[in-house]
Amino acid sequence: MWKRLIPRRRNQSPVTESASKLDVTSQSEKRVDHRATDQTQTAQQNGTAIQAGRDVVVYGGMTYSDVKDAALGVFEANFYRLSSLARQTAEQRAEEVTEKLLERLLREHPEGFAQANDPGFQHALYTVQREHARTGDVNLGGLLVDLLVDRTRHPQRDIMQIVLDESLNTAPKLTEGQLAVLSVVFLFKYTQNQGIGNHQMLGSHMDRVLQPFAAKVQKNNAWYQHLEFTGCGTIGLGEIGLESILGTTYQGLFLKGFDPSEISARGITAGSEPRLFMSCLNDPSKIQVRTNSHETLESLFDQAAILTEDRQKIKGLFDETKMSESEIQAKCIELCPYMAHLFDVWSDSPMKNFTLTSVGIAIGHANIRKIAGEFANLAIWIN
């Protein structure tokens, strides 16, 4: 389960907003393509399937070929005239990114084909085609396709559609390193994976969604000024250390533990309630509070019907046994050596002061999903 976090400054109590549960498909669940031999027909609601060796899906009266022709027609009608060789390259790139988009829609959201003749969609599509034709950047093309597929899920003019349209125009103005900055800031300041229960799980999570960006971030002040200029975020006066963020979001992973005798010594009437206490992750000779954060601790209190007096005493144990920031940093680097570079850049750059806008969140989110695959729905943060 993922949860949206609201960024906070140092010494400010953490504030969170709950998000709906998300069922993420396991990485081990691979799609198998039987289309070459399987004659079973499928069609989405409002669609018609015609047998032709493989399915030819007609959605809203348009076949895949119809949609492709319409999509390429948008590019032909709008892209400026170039010399013969340059035009050939541009057309080839536009067709490549269009094919990627249509394949993604066919696989993930075929209802999106119904927007082929919508002016707003065509404008967004042309933005993707134009930027990929101009740069030929495969990574940028993949990011723009991700954003446009998301846009097809919002045919009505709502805040999500507006943010995604703006993101399509903004992403091409950024370097790969700046995209990495948005993803790293988004991951640390705006997300919490509530399924993480031990150090191994935290390490695996970071390897999947963070490691691909770690080496790309830099301290260059001009990067952050440009991100601010493009509307992806703001450089504020307040700052927060990466150790502080991790120590709040995943506090339960960074506890030193305490002797079991502390429970009776502090007069906690609930005793060694197994729903509240467990063996310490960092020192098996001790025990710790069984939670990652103050918010989940409150839920545990409610489930176990813990008395008000006991709650304050247990919170005291939770906070008093927390590692120092230097110890948290050392533990993270022990788990993931590439974190050393991130701690260094974060502490000595505007990253610690950077707050994302809705556009920065959308681009950072899409960049993570492009690399990691399955990820939480953007609607958790923008709605």
Where are these regions (language model features)?
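Short alpha-helical segments that sit at the start of domains
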Residues: R157-I196
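A compositional/structural signature marking long, glycine- and acidic/polar-rich segments
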Residues: I6-R8, V24-T25, G197-D207
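Conserved aromatic-histidine-acidic binding/catalytic patches
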Residues: H132, E166, T170-L174, Q211-A215
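Short helix-coil junctions and helix-kink-helix linkers
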Residues: Y190, M201-Q218
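Long, low-complexity intrinsically disordered regions enriched in small/polar
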Residues: W2-L85
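Eukaryotic partner-binding/assembly regions in large regulatory complexes
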Residues: A49-Q51, D55-L168
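Alpha-helix C-caps/helix-loop-beta hinges
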Residues: T230-G231
